[in-house]
């Protein structure tokens, strides 16, 4: 796709497959524009392939269009993250967009753990996620969102954010989450909306069904205070699989990210059958 001097067109396609002796390999890697990946890493051993996605270094601005496609084959295990926050800047009258497509086959495992997206003044953004799983797949993912510069008075006074996440299992729509938030919209202040918090996040996981005790334990990790609020729920899919959702509102991204990380650390061994190992990039 073409690009101009003042806007990016960028895309990335990644395919993970089982290799020799239980190793997961990055079998397909293609890109156009300024979107790349660092080399595949194996901090957990050969079974789990870790990849960091590099967004355009200057951030995302009006008119930019990014697309990410990830395909995890049966028997493969992949963990994807980003080395830093994704920054969305002033739109100058043109909407910026990012479309993420995740596919996991039966027997495949995926962690989708990008660091936060920060939407600055006058950003006009469309962020869509489409997750397609086969029964027998297992995956955990999240979105961490900050509206404006939290340390500034009257943060995010102009802008618009449209988000949409759809999760399918065997072609059936299991969960959809859509939001359209303008900087001056009442939903930012309403108790039934963002309740005045500048940071919000959602985590989803699909895989082996959690029992009642595990649901209680997960709920027990959720905070509830004037500055940080979390909640978790589980929806059965069938006798052996379920969808788990975790949401969090907060004043500071660091606190919200910590809640999401704790939830992921609890869910990962139970859903992905893999101990929780925090990506090393997050410590740099």
Curated annotation (Swiss-Prot):
Originating organism: Bordetella pertussis (strain Tohama I / ATCC BAA-589 / NCTC 13251)
Primary localization class, coarse: cytoplasm
A GO MF term: nickel cation binding
Protein name (record): Urease accessory protein UreD
Key words of the record: Chaperone, Cytoplasm, Nickel insertion
One GO location term (cellular component): cytoplasm
Cytoplasm recorded as keyword: yes
Role according to the record: Required for maturation of urease via the functional incorporation of the urease nickel metallocenter.
Compartmental location: Cytoplasm
Family of the protein in this entry: Belongs to the UreD family.
Gene, per the UniProt record: ureD
């Amino acid at each position: 796709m073409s690009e101009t001097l003042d806007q990016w067109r960028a895309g990335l396609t990644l395919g993970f497959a089982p290799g020799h002796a239980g190793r997961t390999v990055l079998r397909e890697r293609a890109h156009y524009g300024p979107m790349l990946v660092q080399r595949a890493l194996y901090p957990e051993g050969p079974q789990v392939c870790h990849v960091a996605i590099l967004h355009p270094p200057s951030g995302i601005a009006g008119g930019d269009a990014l697309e990410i496609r990830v395909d995890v084959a049966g028997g493969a295990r992949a963990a994807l993250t980003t080395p830093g926050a994704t920054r969305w800047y002033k739109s100058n009258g043109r909407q910026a967009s990012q479309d993420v497509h995740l596919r996991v086959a039966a027997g495949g495992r995926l962690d989708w753990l990008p660091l936060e997206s920060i939407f600055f003044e006058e950003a006009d953004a469309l962020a869509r996620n489409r997750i397609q799983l086969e029964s027998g797949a297992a995956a955990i993912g999240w979105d961490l969102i900050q509206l404006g510069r939290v340390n500034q008075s009257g943060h995010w006074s102009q802008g618009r954010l449209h988000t949409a996440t759809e999760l399918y299992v065997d072609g059936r729509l299991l969960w959809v989450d859509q939001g359209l938030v303008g900087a001056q919209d009442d939903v930012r202040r309403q108790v039934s909306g963002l309740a005045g918090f500048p940071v919000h996040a959602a985590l989803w996981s699909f895989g082996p069904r959690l029992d009642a005790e595990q649901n209680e334990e997960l709920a027990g990790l959720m905070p509830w205070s004037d500055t940080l609020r979390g909640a978790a729920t589980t929806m059965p899919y069938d006798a052996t699989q379920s969808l788990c959702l975790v949401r969090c509102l907060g004043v500071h991204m660091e606190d919200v990210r910590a809640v999401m990380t704790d939830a992921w650390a609890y869910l990962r061994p139970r859903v992905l059958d893999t101990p929780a190992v925090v990506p090393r990039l997050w410590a740099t």
